[in-house]
């Protein structure tokens, strides 16, 4: 089966680099599925889970907090604002962050504080959704 080169990088480190059969991620206008031979594209990505079906059939999961996606004829590059390997996601920390953001929304004094709290809430909610999705795909409840 044909494959495509996939790189997922953040400002801190390279999270994944290898050949893949399929990549799915949250694009700006909805979920994107990428197979080898996909039309070239550059778009923003929303916070959420990136699922990579590697050449050997194993699945890799990465949480991204947004960023840019570039698709070229032989390569997919995800430039993430922040990226966390699926196995490193911490549900308790994400839930705590969600609660803090919700509290901050109730106690904001300025538009900037409100916007910051909204962004933090969106990030935590997306991270929790990615954890739930990963758990479901692994057959755990």
Swiss-Prot record:
<keyword id="KW-0472">Membrane</keyword>
<dbReference type="InterPro" id="IPR036771">
    <property type="entry name" value="ATPsynth_dsu/esu_N"/>
</dbReference>
<keyword id="KW-0139">CF(1)</keyword>
<dbReference type="InterPro" id="IPR001469">
    <property type="entry name" value="ATP_synth_F1_dsu/esu"/>
</dbReference>
<dbReference type="InterPro" id="IPR036794">
    <property type="entry name" value="ATP_F1_dsu/esu_C_sf"/>
</dbReference>
<protein>
    <recommendedName>
        <fullName>ATP synthase epsilon chain</fullName>
    </recommendedName>
</protein>
<keyword id="KW-1003">Cell membrane</keyword>
<dbReference type="GO" id="GO:0005886">
    <property type="term" value="C:plasma membrane"/>
</dbReference>
<comment type="similarity">
    <text>Belongs to the ATPase epsilon chain family.</text>
</comment>
<keyword id="KW-0813">Transport</keyword>
<keyword id="KW-0997">Cell inner membrane</keyword>
<keyword id="KW-0406">Ion transport</keyword>
<dbReference type="GO" id="GO:0046933">
    <property type="term" value="F:proton-transporting ATP synthase activity, rotational mechanism"/>
</dbReference>
<keyword id="KW-0066">ATP synthesis</keyword>
<keyword id="KW-0375">Hydrogen ion transport</keyword>
<dbReference type="Pfam" id="PF02823">
    <property type="entry name" value="ATP-synt_DE_N"/>
</dbReference>
<comment type="subunit">
    <text>F-type ATPases have 2 components, CF(1) - the catalytic core - and CF(0) - the membrane proton channel. CF(1) has five subunits: alpha(3), beta(3), gamma(1), delta(1), epsilon(1). CF(0) has three main subunits: a, b and c.</text>
</comment>
<comment type="function">
    <text>Produces ATP from ADP in the presence of a proton gradient across the membrane.</text>
</comment>
<dbReference type="GO" id="GO:0005524">
    <property type="term" value="F:ATP binding"/>
</dbReference>
<dbReference type="InterPro" id="IPR020546">
    <property type="entry name" value="ATP_synth_F1_dsu/esu_N"/>
</dbReference>
<dbReference type="Pfam" id="PF00401">
    <property type="entry name" value="ATP-synt_DE"/>
</dbReference>
<dbReference type="InterPro" id="IPR020547">
    <property type="entry name" value="ATP_synth_F1_esu_C"/>
</dbReference>
<dbReference type="GO" id="GO:0045259">
    <property type="term" value="C:proton-transporting ATP synthase complex"/>
</dbReference>
